[in-house]
Amino acid sequence: VLSEEDKSHVKAIWGKVAGHLEEYGAEALERMFCAYPQTKIYFPHFDMSHNSAQIRGHGKKVFAALHDAVNHIDDLAGALCRLSDLHAHNLRVDPVNFKFLSQCILVVFGVHHPCSLTPEVHASLDKFLCAVSAMLTSKYR
């Protein structure tokens, strides 16, 4: 459960990210594909080269969904319901991949905003990403 302090931390650091959704999203995906190459199986039609339009486009979608989740942080279930259905029933993404992507997102935040990603903010952002992952996998059961 996210505390009010967690929510405040997430909203504050997300404010620094909001103008870079495509850039940071693509970087997180590239990191995931490199560190966890098995995740590429969900994207067989993607050009996996650095800075490809497909990775940038999907990265923007991922970060736009996270942006929406931040804006609806008190109703993650409502904000992510459609995506939960999509990932569980149509895409059938292995839930572990959400953890992999979350780790890569934390790295991207650390690279671009090292002074803002204090231990407390890091913990809050990790809790938020875990909550998002839990919502996205809630329809798997």
Curated annotation (Swiss-Prot):
One of its GO terms (molecular function) is heme binding. Residues 1-141 form the Globin domain. The keyword Metal-binding applies. Heme b binds at residue 87. Keywords: Heme, Iron, Metal-binding, Oxygen transport, Transport. The keyword Metal-binding applies. Red blood cells. PROSITE patterns: GLOBIN (PS01033). It holds the Pfam family Globin. InterPro entries: Globin, Globin-like_sf, Globin/Proto, Hemoglobin_a-typ, Hemoglobin_oxygen_transport, Hemoglobin_pi. GO terms for biological process: hydrogen peroxide catabolic process. O2 binds at residue 58. GO terms for cellular component: blood microparticle; haptoglobin-hemoglobin complex; hemoglobin complex. Heterotetramer of two alpha chains and two beta chains. Involved in oxygen transport from the lung to the various peripheral tissues. PANTHER family: HEMOGLOBIN FAMILY MEMBER (PTHR11442), HEMOGLOBIN SUBUNIT ALPHA (PTHR11442:SF48). Belongs to the globin family. This is Hemoglobin subunit alpha. The lineage of its organism: Eukaryota, Metazoa, Chordata, Craniata, Vertebrata.
